[in-house]
């Protein structure tokens, strides 16, 4: 979908660039496929902030999206494409031949009336899901499982995709948009195509209030805090911090690797996403 830019009739309109969602469904979601969603405000079960800069925002209903695509060999027709406030991608309402309805992630170039199917070996059309064992090499895919039957976890955000580049001893090699090359089991499901709404990253919300509507609060720099609140805090006048950039808890930030190298999935990463960086 295209981007909409606005004339600066007010300060909040100046620089505003939003996604044109005029072609999406304008009604409410299917009630049987929605749940209530309680806001956490970034707090955990003890009431402490574990994820900063969250809180407020408009109320949402959670749409139950089918990431597993495990209803095999039953064709489904796309009824409509909908907006989902809980993710950057759009979602598609599909109706199976047996009458069941489900929400799936809408890939690019999926239109109302299209047929989609999940099968052991399906046509290479956007929205069709199949395991890597039945897929030709070179296919662009999204919503990729990391464990068979667990549901898609990789390449679910707007505009993302991965490329199936090879097979190796029961594993499929996929190249992610970050540049990472990794292995997943051939039994893992993936959906053909790239995720919808590729222009999402080109939006400019124009004013802080629009981010507050999305539930995002201001990000305060450590250098303007007091010493009790941040390692960069304190000092008379403006100071540069006096040490390498760290988080509020003293851990190095801005590029420091934090991934645990003892993770079980570490051996499935053939080429790190950092390998392309100079001097690394």
From Swiss-Prot:
The keyword Ribonucleoprotein applies. The keyword ATP-binding does not apply. Residues 209-219 have a biased composition (Basic residues). One of its GO terms (cellular component) is large ribosomal subunit. SMART domains: Ribosomal_L2 (SM01383), Ribosomal_L2_C (SM01382). GO terms for molecular function: rRNA binding; structural constituent of ribosome; transferase activity. Gene3D superfamilies: 2.30.30.30, Nucleic acid-binding proteins, Ribosomal protein L2, domain 3. InterPro entries: NA-bd_OB-fold (IPR012340), Rib_uL2_dom2 (IPR014722), Ribosomal_uL2 (IPR002171), Ribosomal_uL2_bac/org-type (IPR005880), Ribosomal_uL2_C (IPR022669), Ribosomal_uL2_CS (IPR022671), Ribosomal_uL2_dom3 (IPR014726), Ribosomal_uL2_RNA-bd_dom (IPR022666). Transmembrane segments: none annotated. Residues 33-55, 199-266 are annotated as: Disordered. Pfam families: Ribosomal_L2, Ribosomal_L2_C. Keywords: Ribonucleoprotein, Ribosomal protein, RNA-binding, rRNA-binding. GO terms for biological process: cytoplasmic translation. One of the primary rRNA binding proteins. Required for association of the 30S and 50S subunits to form the 70S ribosome, for tRNA binding and peptide bond formation. It has been suggested to have peptidyltransferase activity; this is somewhat controversial. Makes several contacts with the 16S rRNA in the 70S ribosome. Part of the 50S ribosomal subunit. Forms a bridge to the 30S subunit in the 70S ribosome. Belongs to the universal ribosomal protein uL2 family. This is Large ribosomal subunit protein uL2. It comes from Ruegeria sp. (strain TM1040) (Silicibacter sp.).
């Amino acid at each position: 979908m295209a981007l909409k830019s606005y004339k600066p009739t007010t300060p909040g309109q100046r620089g505003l660039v939003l996604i044109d969602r005029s072609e999406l469904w304008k009604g409410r979601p299917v009630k049987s496929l929605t749940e209530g969603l309680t806001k956490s405000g970034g707090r955990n079960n003890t009431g402490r902030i574990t994820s900063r800069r969250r809180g407020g925002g408009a109320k949402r209903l959670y749409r139950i999206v089918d990431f597993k695509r495990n209803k095999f060999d039953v064709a489904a027709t796309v009824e409509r494409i909908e907006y989902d406030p809980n993710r950057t991608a759009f979602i598609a309402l599909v109706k199976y031949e047996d009458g069941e309805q489900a929400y799936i992630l809408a890939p690019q170039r999926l239109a109302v009336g299209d047929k989609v199917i999940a099968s052991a070996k399906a046509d290479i059309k956007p929205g069709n899901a199949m395991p890597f064992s039945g897929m030709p090499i070179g296919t662009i895919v999204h919503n990729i499982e990391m464990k068979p039957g667990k549901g898609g976890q990789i390449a679910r955000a707007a505009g993302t995709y991965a490329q199936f580049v090879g097979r190796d001893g029961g594993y499929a090699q996929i190249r992610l948009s970050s540049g990472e090359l990794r292995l997943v089991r051939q039994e893992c499901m993936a959906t053909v195509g790239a995720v919808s709404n590729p222009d999402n990253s080109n939006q400019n919300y124009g004013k802080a209030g629009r981010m507050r509507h999305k539930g995002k609060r201001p990000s305060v720099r450590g250098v303007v805090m007091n010493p009790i609140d941040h390692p960069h805090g304190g000092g008379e006048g403006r100071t540069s911090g006096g040490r390498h950039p760290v988080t509020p808890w003293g851990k190095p930030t801005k590029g420091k690797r934090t991934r645990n190298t003892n993770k079980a999935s570490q051996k499935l990463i053939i080429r790190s996403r950092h390998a392309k960086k100079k001097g690394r």
